[in-house]
Amino acid sequence: MDWLAKYWWILVLVFLVGVLLNVIKDLKRIDHKKFLANKPELPPHRDFNDKWDDEEDWPKKDQPKK
């Protein structure tokens, strides 16, 4: 078990390389063109700013300056 205490980092590197290879393999399987052709419509973004921002902050262009 002395070798495990000295070389534990090699096992970690082998594990990370395996994870990286599986990620690359899974990403190659994704067909992004097919997804983009059939992607669902997103609902409109609701941020509820319309409830408190009723006043107009910007001056109108045709209004004379004070």
Swiss-Prot record:
Q: Which domain of life is it from?
A: Bacteria
- Keyword Cell membrane, does the record have it? yes
A single GO cellular-component term on record: plasma membrane
Q: Where in the cell is it found?
A: Cell membrane
Keyword terms, alphabetized: Cell membrane, Membrane, Transmembrane, Transmembrane helix
**Does the keyword field hold Thylakoid?**
no
Q: Write out the transmembrane intervals.
A: 4-24
Which Pfam families does this UniProt record tie to the protein? UPF0370
**InterPro entries the UniProt entry points to:** UPF0370
Q: Where is the composition biased (Basic and acidic residues)?
A: 42-51
The segments labelled Disordered in the record are 39-66
What disulfide bonds does the UniProt entry report for this chain? none
Membrane topology category: Single-pass membrane protein
Primary localization class, coarse: membrane
What's the family? Belongs to the UPF0370 family.
What is the name attached to this protein's record?
Answer: UPF0370 protein YpfN
